[in-house]
Structure formats: C-alpha cells, structure tokens
Regions:
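Glycine-rich phosphate-binding loops of nucleotide-dependent enzymes
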Residues: 2-259
C-alpha cells in the first residue's frame, strides 16, 4: 500500500476554551480529490492552517508523504510542495493577470528580480502561459487583476498556487461567491488540475462537493463525524442530521445516494 499524501495523528488545536481541531487522525490517499465538509465552526480552515504551517498544533503530528512536517514554517512547507488558497482572495490588483502569475512564480522559486521583465525569462514565460491555460484565463492575460470578475479572481489565485507545480493543493472554498456559470467553469478546471495534482478542498456547495470529490470527510466540532465516498456520505444519517439535512439539500442528497 502506498504512503498517504497527507496523514495526521491526534492533531489538536485549541483557542482558549474552544477546541477547534479535536484529536484528529486522518489519512488521505494520493491521486484523488478529497473534500472536507462540515458546518461553520467545524474546524475545516483551522485544519488547513495546521497543515500549511500558519498555525502550530497544541498536540499531534502532521505528515506529508511520510515526512513529519509538524512545526515547519509556512514557506518551508510551501517549498516541500504544498500550496493553498485562502477564503479571502489575495491578488495584486494593479498588475496584469500574467504578471500576477509571473511575480508569484519568481518569488516562490527564490529568483525574484524586480528589474527583469517576464519576457526575458523564457522558462518563467512558459510557466505563465501553461498556467493561464490551466485556469482558463489566457484571453485575459493582459487585464489588470483588479478589473476581473470575482470568479476570474478566484481562478487567478488558484493559478498563483499551481504555477510552481505543487504536488498537493489545498483549496479553501474556491467557488464561494461565484455565479453558477463561474462555478461550473471552476469545477471543470479543478477536475483538470486533479489529473496531476493531489487536491484537498473545503467547500460548502454540495453540488461542487459531490460533483468533484472522490472521498469526503465530514467534520463536526473539530472531530471526524464520517468519512467515505460521496454516495456513502450522502446515505449517512449522522451527516444528514448534522449537515446535509437542510431542505434545500434534500433533492441533491437523493441524487447522490442513487448515483
């Protein structure tokens, strides 16, 4: 059996009297899209923060492809091949789409030269062009990022994460705020990325979750409530009660059960 791409052992993080992540042990296989879902306050983003090094655990360990990365700094974890996006989108609004990608690529490869243009670096230019295609923004390469639609900004941020070719991508609510058309395009692009990058996604849109994930873990109060395939999760009474039982989700749950 191959080593899991990500594994945690008894991971715990508290904020005062609140236990945000509670003794969480999880093993995520490579070559799949794994969704983390749960009600607000379930510990999903805190889990991402612990994996990416933005927070340190009170106890427990984090392993990436068998390597203990507990306590590593965010830039160290990034260089190991883990990249992430944030709920609050962060781009350079006055720079073009292409320059956002270029400057991120250069900064993360530690070859940032402020007075060197993207055109003078053939490899960087090639990486930018490749990434523009991956995120579907080739036609907007010259547009200032601040003039993009919300959906295109979200895709640009994903591009800024993948331009350095990570092996694990953490997506924190990538479709939040998107129109249905933007969501559909984003899902298609994320599926394409998943062919070569392991992806863990936090998402509240159940259509997105059940349409894109191979495996789903449900968190509640910082602990694992259930884990399994989309059909197994949709058919789990505990999940229905805790998360999927809202009236607006019922039709889709029934579809997932019988898929």
């Amino acid at each position: 059996m191959s080593e899991p791409v990500l594994r945690t052992e008894n991971l715990t993080r508290r904020f005062g009297g609140l236990t945000a992540v509670d003794n969480l042990s999880i093993s995520l296989a490579g070559g799949r899209v794994h969704a983390i879902i749960g009600p607000n306050g379930a510990g999903k983003t805190t889990f991402f923060n612990l994996v990416s090094g933005l927070l340190g655990p009170d106890s427990g360990r984090v392993f990436f492809r068998g390597r203990d990365i507990t306590g590593c700094k965010p830039h160290e974890i990034s260089r190991m091949g883990i990249k992430r996006t944030l709920q609050v989108k962060s781009v350079f609004p006055k720079l073009s789409v292409a320059d956002n990608l270029w400057i991120t690529r250069q900064a993360r490869s530690r070859f940032l030269h402020p007075f060197r243009s993207a055109a003078s670096d053939l490899q960087a230019k090639s990486d930018v062009e490749r990434t523009l295609g991956q995120i579907g923004l080739t036609g907007l390469a010259g547009r200032p990022a601040g003039t993009l639609s919300y959906g295109d900004v979200a895709m640009l941020e994903i591009g800024m994460a993948v331009i350095s070719e990570p092996s694990l991508l953490l997506l924190d609510e990538p479709t939040c705020g998107m129109s249905p058309a933007e969501t559909s395009r984003a899902v298609a692009k994320i599926r394409d990325l998943a062919r070569t990058i392991d992806i863990i996604i936090i998402e509240h849109d159940m259509d997105v979750v059940f349409g894109i994930a191979n495996d789903i873990t449900v968190l509640a109060q910082g602990a694992i409530l259930a884990s399994g395939t989309p059909a197994e999760i949709a058919d789990d009474e505990r999940v229905r009660e805790a998360y999927l039982g809202r009236p607006e989700d019922e039709d889709f749950v029934e579809e997932a059960i019988h898929a």
